Amino acid sequence: EILLGKLSVNEGMFYENVIAQMLVAAGHKLYFYTRYNQEKHRNDMEIDFILSNHSKLRYKIFPIEVKSNDKYSIRSLTRFNESFRQRIGGSYVIHPKNLSVKEGVVYLPAYMTFCL
């Protein structure tokens, strides 16, 4: 079911944890980002994972959103990219579809997570 994109909410969390494990196994330190909106009393932006190139001279970050379904929104990723434009080295969405690149965002199937 993971590969077919037929996951429930709880299984979606499982999917995200599998991706986290793959990133850690590849040697990455994992970071995340949330922004709390005081007026709405909720998080209005959340990035699942942020990787870093650890360069002292040209430090860049790489936000990653994990999507377990075929239909999804990347509003948080788009807003994050706008807010931190100077620091972004590349943006990724890990999803159940094929590899593609649209508007500067690389969309990777889950099995290609090791490429990051």
Where are these regions (language model features)?
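A cross-kingdom feature that marks ATP-driven nucleic-acid transaction machinery
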Residues: E1-L116
